[in-house]
Every structure is written in structure tokens, then in C-alpha cells.
Amino acid sequence: MAATDLLAGRATLSRSLRLLSAFRFEQTDPDRFYGALASDTVAMVDDLWRATTGTSTRNLTVLDVGGGPGYFASAFTDAGLHYVGVEPDPGEMHAAAPRTHSRAGSFVRASGTALPFADGSVDICLSSNVAEHVAQPWRLGEEMLRVTRPGGLAVLSYTVWLGPFGGHEMGLSHYLGGYRAAERYTRRHGHRPKNDYGSSLFAVSAADGLRWARSTGALAAAFPRYHPRWAWGLTRVPGVREFLVSNLVLVLRPT
């Protein structure tokens, strides 16, 4: 069975529209947005694991690189996994506490590009919407592969720069250039964007991600995260994928 066979059955247009409708609440109602994203991410990881290994994810250890404010911790724990979150920002770690129940895993303050874990120490290593926020995204990817055990899964998902959501809260102004978009946002709102181009937001392309993933020899699948199954072929079209694949998922299985 191919890694995406189970997920393909769930990748419907209604799912895509449901997730798209949640995006507009990212700033105004983060519980609604991140709660929906966390639930969908757990289901995606479960589908990928079961299709690849034929076994359940229950009692596996998942390392979430860029765990953020706790939504994923609760969702993965509720699904029966042992959750460990890595987060470099202490503010995000403190924000996680009210959103996680008492048994929702643990958090480690560290950088995703220098993970403080032994080689092959986790079953699943996940990074959701983090690679575009670090200056060395493929060093992050290499670290994810290093800590994932042979036969496990590393799932790296990131926002493609030239896609419609590449500018994050700066909107479509990122098509004018990242620095210009950040300055425009600052003039309009009186403060720098949280996702500030050149410091906390970087231009990461689909082509670069696919090139890196293929170079590892561990690539099991690549697909657009939020698209219905019939649109997954966009990933194979150079140029077009940069604009129409809003978020690329790279699934790697180290041996």
C-alpha cells in the first residue's frame, strides 16, 4: 500500500473547504482554527502510518518540532500517542499550559535545527508549518530524519512562499516582495508582523523541498496538504506548484 492510500480517501473537497473556512479565524479565534488543524493533522499522521506500516499509532512516540501553544499536544495525546513537543519560544510554551490537559505529553525548549534527542529515538517526527519560519529549513529536515527510527516516519509540512498563504498575516502583499510586504504591514498596523520576512518568515519553495527530500533517499510521498485528492497532481507540475500548492507535505521513511 502506498503511503497516501488511506489519506486519499479522506482528502475530499468538503474537507478542503472546511479547513479553508477555519483559516480566517487564525488571528481572531485561534482555538477554532488550531483546534481544527490539530484534529486533521492527527488523522493525517494516523493515515500515513497505518498505510505505511499496517499497524496502529497507539502508544507510539511522536516528536512535534515547533509544538506551539498546545493544541497538537492534546489532540495527539487523546489519540493515544506519547507526545513530545519542541518549541524554542518560551512564550509559546507558557501559552500551551492552559490548552493541554494534565497528561498531554511534555515540552522541551530547543531549536528544531539542533534537536536534543538521540539518533533513532522516536517513532514519528512531525513538523507542521515551521520550515518557512527558520533560515535553514533543510537542516531542520535532516534533524527530523536523524531522530526518527528506521521504519518510522518523518512528516515535514510547510507553507509554500508563492502560494496564497505564503505571506501569512501580510496577506497577498507578499507577491510585491517579502520586505516590502512587511514594511507595508508595519505602516498599516503600527507594529511589525509576527511573521516578519527575513527574521521569522522565509521564502521556501516547493521545488527546494522536493529536491531536498529526493536527495535523502527516504522520500515516501509528497502531496498538497489541504487539497482534495484530484488536485494532488499539481505537486508534479514545476512552476504551477509554487502558486497552487499552498502547503507541501513531505513524508520520509528512514531505513
Swiss-Prot record:
Keywords: Methyltransferase, Transferase
Single GO molecular function: S-adenosylmethionine-dependent methyltransferase activity
CDD domains, sorted: AdoMet_MTases
Assigned EC number: 2.1.1.-
InterPro entries per UniProt: Methyltransf_11, SAM-dependent_MTases_sf
Origin: domain of life: Bacteria
Keyword rRNA processing on entry: no
Gene Ontology annotations of biological process type: methylation
PANTHER family: 2-METHOXY-6-POLYPRENYL-1,4-BENZOQUINOL METHYLASE, MITOCHONDRIAL, METHYLTRANSFERASE
UniProt record similarity statement: Belongs to the methyltransferase superfamily.
Name of protein: Uncharacterized methyltransferase Mflv_0427
